[in-house]
Amino acid sequence: EATLRMLYEVQRQAIPELTRVFGHTGLYLRPCEALAPALSGNMLAQVLSLYREGGRLRGELACEDEALPVASGTVSLAYALCVLETSPRPEALLGELARVLKPGGVALLITLNPWGLARLRWSFRGLDAVDPAVLGQWLAGRGLDIERQRWLGPMWAPPRGTDLQETPAGGLLAGLRAGHLVVARRREAGLTPLRAGKPALSLRPGMSAG
């Protein structure tokens, strides 16, 4: 199916981000059972893989979106592939992903691009795309700082038999790709974003602060 091939291509382009995350445990949420449960490219010892079925998540465990059966602060990577769009409570699901992350842990979130050409394939299915600006607000409110974000995936999922590879497109055209990737890191305990203030005093040899 064209949609599945599009999702695999989006995942393929996100692999470089996976290789930057190390640790013991990861959590992988995918939009359907048809997608492979293995998270290709990850550098973790083990990954709990769940998929969307109706309004719940199933797989190695079964749960509601707002009650992931994972202890707080135990996951090095939370990888969510197009599951916010199908969630009955996307903001609550994001809150759960933030909860299970260790301080310094990484959330890798891939959402459908609400302005991409490929939206014509899924908009009629009742999926509600998450605006990247809104997603950024949700992350900030849950102690996650965005490190990188970009558009990725193909412009359009072509018919079966067509080679689906990334086409060179940047600038304004990049915003027409199928997906949007956000890499966010959970703030270390006790750290808050710095506010702009007076420049720090620079001491020269022989000077003291007092």
Where would I find each of the regions flagged by the language model?
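Conserved catalytic loop of SAM-dependent methyltransferase domains
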Residues: 147-179
